[in-house]
Amino acid sequence: MCALKGFLEENFYTYSVAKGNHSTVYEFILLGLTDNAELQVTLFGIFLVVYLASFMGNFGLIMLIQISPQLHTPMYFFLSHLAFVDFSFTSSVAPNTLVNFLCEVKSITFYACAIQVCCFITFVVCELYLLSIMAYDRYVAICNPLLYVILIPRKLCIKLIASTYVYGFTVGLVQTVATSYLSFCDSNVINHFYHDDVPLVALACSDTHVKELMLLIIAGFNTLCSLVIVLISYGFIFFAILRIHSAEGRQKAFSTSASHLTSITIFYGTIIFMYPQPKSSHSLNMDKVASVFNVVVIPTLNPLIYSLRNQEVKNALKRIIEKLCLAVK
């Protein structure tokens, strides 16, 4: 991390000074969601409650999976990592946003901004591929239940998760380094409530065509690749469910994928809205609204979606509560 800091600061300084005829920017100021002081206090309270709910929901789900032997399956192994990524995703933005709600000047250094961008992109990419891995897991469980243990062994699960984290960090690092090659001068005001690539590119005073093309290609590629895996998996699942003769069997097969399908629809919908679109049609104000939903709401909803619609999770939670009640008595 120190090496990354040194590279970013040195590269940013060298490139900005080389442009000349401009005052170099070393920190940024966020406009936030609103300039209304009373509304900012209200938003602080809302964001704090939602962030704490995200923490309790996601880490509660992780702990429940860890201490419940009946949940020690590939599906819940992936779900525990999705919960971790969800909370990390929110934590890359929410703490700084909460502080800014209470500050008159919402400033941040270039280094801190770069770290936030890198973490944000890393966890977005991780979530994309985790959702696609979970879709494949549901495909195997429904279409090839007898081969489930053979097709998705423990070692494969670990390799898939490790690959997701490594690839996500690589994409985040590449995008952050590419952003450091931009020159930021004169204006240092970012029209957003956190440091994202899109508003940063809009602020740059150097040529941004390469960076914009890179952002579009990488965002489009990762969204499309993961979405194709999801669509193919659910295509096979859909036809497999149609071949089930009993209504009860169809209902059981569908219920195992319903929560995951709900989560996918919400997440991909906001991602497609936010990133793979041309600059001329991109509204930063609309991006703020989508970002609040993507960064704050979805990571909080996911534990509820997977808990309330999943009988195995509800049964495991019920057993834990019963054990606690017996221990208290």
Curated annotation (Swiss-Prot):
Membrane topology category: Multi-pass membrane protein
Segments on the Extracellular side according to the record's topology features: 1-44, 95-113, 179-220, 275-287
Disulfide feature: 113-205
Record carries keyword Cell cycle: no
Main location as per UniProt: membrane
Entry's localization field: Cell membrane
One example GO MF annotation: G protein-coupled receptor activity
Glycosylated position list: 21
PROSITE patterns: G_PROTEIN_RECEP_F1_1, G_PROTEIN_RECEP_F1_2
Domain of life, source organism: Eukaryota
Keyword Protein biosynthesis carried by entry: no
Family per record: Belongs to the G-protein coupled receptor 1 family.
Name of the protein in question: Olfactory receptor 5AL1
